[in-house]
Amino acid sequence: MKAIGRVILSAILLVLTGLMIAFAKAAPSVVFSFYPALSRSILSAIASVSGLVPIALWEVLAVLLALWFFYTLIRVFTGRRSLLCWLSGVLLGLSTGVFLFVAIWGLGHFGPSVDQTLGLDVREYSKQELIAATAYYAAQANEYAEKVERDAENLTVYPAFSELAKQAPGGYAALAQQYDPFTDGLGPVKPLASWRLFSQTGTTGIFICFTAEACVNPDTYTAWIPFTMCHELAHRQAVTAEDDANFCAYLACMASEDDDFRYSGAFGAYIYCHNALSKVDKTAASQIWSTLSDGVIADIRAANEHYAQYEGKVQDAAQKVNDTYLKAFSEESGVQSYGEAADLLIAWYLKNNA
């Protein structure tokens, strides 16, 4: 295809992408009456292929794509390919990627949130409601902390990553019996082979819609691993917003039959609520902290120490990139949306403990 043809096709794809987003914003009741189910069906079809290999297929494809990129760039510098032809090819590749991303999964960013689909009353909460919810999740974390294996330093010890990865879909299978947004039959979570790179950027997990793979960094602190697995599986079910995925991770962990997952879910829920409470009432947050068991406190401190080693300019740059992406797809709080799961957790607490 000539350069002009690539440019024209790129323009068509970008226009179609814009039209999809515009229609989703203009008529959300129409689009999202079918899009979530369609997205899940497409992802399931893709996963039936990518799931045939135990490794993260997208990492292999990313390496091949990078090699192809540099190979074609070298051909430009050696005069075997024109710069215009190369640029038009890059433009077409990017346009195709954006179109497929939005069509397969990304359009969900403009759809209803989990609180709407589950009938939760998310609103502005009083400080007392936040305190009550934080105390509830702290007690829940204490309860399940006693049911998990611990080492000599009182830190959580979980089964191998591969075992947890197989168990992770179980919570969603249970939720699928009660709530429409969830489905069963999810494949296992995959470990990231390039985990060292992701640790440097502060990334604990990633979902790639092109291969429908939910992947988790095996370097994630132990107590967080089941929660993170369920977070990425939430994305696999067309849950796009980060705070929604965090809340779904909690629900899936608590719906699991495994206490390792239940502890991880309660652990994560407490931390999100504690962080929210600390911003408005440090005294109340400290009082609830004092009720935590030694095991929970040991895990929190160990997790903080683990992630502190990766803080730096690389992680800051990665956070800025992620922030830009989230804001581009209607998550106005950007990376802060990872903490807004507290709103959903409070709503869930109030609904079930009224």
Q: Which sequence ranges carry the predicted segments?
A:
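Active-site recognition of the HExxH zinc-binding catalytic motif
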Residues: 54, 225-246, 250-251
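Transmembrane alpha-helices and immediately adjacent membrane-cytoplasm interface residues
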Residues: 67-74, 80-116
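Auxiliary, metal-adjacent structural segments of Zn-dependent hydrolase domains
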Residues: 152-218, 222
